[in-house]
A protein has these predicted regions:
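An N-terminally biased module of ancient metal coordination in phosphate/nucleic-acid-related enzymes
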Residues: 1-44
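Non-catalytic positions within long, well-ordered alpha-helices that form the structural scaffold/packing
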Residues: 6, 99, 156-157
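Divalent metal-coordination and catalytic microenvironments
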Residues: 17, 47, 109, 167, ...
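Active-site environment of divalent metal-dependent phosphoester hydrolases
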Residues: 20-23, 54-57, 112-116, 140-143, ...
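Short acidic, glycine/proline-enriched helix-loop-strand junctions
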Residues: 23-32, 41-46, 173-199
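Short acidic/histidine-rich active-site segments
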Residues: 158-176
Length: 232
């Protein structure tokens, strides 16, 4: 996967294993593996750790004790993943409580979550509350179907999206590759937006800085003209 990233021109990678009831997040072991890989790749990649954090009670208790273990590069941005069975109304308060600790939630791949696709007003509320949103590069490239692609592009246009990430899982079907997604965003929104989502905001989160690009959330925009989708 590291070789895939280097070939794609990627310079910074955050390894984000799941942290939930099924997958135990062992911070010490994750850091050991990160250090081993960093030594192997040298200065070709800058590697950090984080996790895809599920908001279950046990996880939240651990977060209160030491949030840095779970955050990107042990700074203050946290990747948050929702399940597709239910997102309780209390989630508004849960996200707010996380923010009060100084942690900045980044909601991951909402364009692939059926609940949030059906109720994008919830996503908009959280963004207006100060949360951030990350969509998957594969969604923008059409790899997760036309609905995920459509919603991801529309939400970028509405100012809901702050990051694009690979969400890579392997070297075959979900690889560390972002060039097709970058081309898609640049074709529809221009180079400035592409740089913000793929380079400038991600680097700021990596370093624990304020995001340089936080667009104002717009009301729902009309769908783009059909011809704009055919850029492959």
């Amino acid at each position: 996967m590291a070789q895939c990233a280097i070939a794609d021109g990627i310079t910074h990678v955050v390894a984000t294993p799941h942290s939930n009831s099924r997958f135990h997040f062992d911070f010490v072991r994750v850091r050991e593996l990160r250090d081993e890989l960093q030594a192997a790749v040298g200065d070709k990649l800058n590697l950090a750790t984080g996790c895809d954090f599920h908001l279950d009670p046990e996880n939240l208790d651990s977060l209160r004790k030491d949030a840095s273990h779970y955050c990107i590069n042990q700074r203050n941005y946290l990747l948050v993943e929702f399940n597709e069975i239910s997102i309780p109304p209390s989630m508004d308060q849960t996200l707010h409580e996380i923010q009060l600790t100084g942690v900045r939630p980044i909601i991951t791949h909402p364009e692939r979550n059926g609940i949030l696709r059906a109720h994008p007003e919830r996503l908009k509320k959280w963004v207006r509350q100060g949360c951030f949103v990350q969509v998957t590069g594969g969604s923008l490239a059409g790899n997760f179907g036309p609905r995920a692609q459509k919603d991801a592009l529309q939400w970028i246009g509405e100012g809901l999206v702050h990051f694009v990430a690979s969400d890579a899982h392997n070297t075959r079907t979900r690889t560390l590759q972002l060039q097709p997604a970058y081309a898609a965003v640049m074709a529809q929104f221009g180079v400035e937006k592409a740089q913000a989502l793929f380079l400038e905001n991600p680097l700021a989160a990596f370093e624990g800085r304020e995001l340089p690009h936080v667009p104002e959330v717009e009301d729902e925009l009309p769908p783009p003209r059909r011809k704009r989708f055919f850029f492959f």
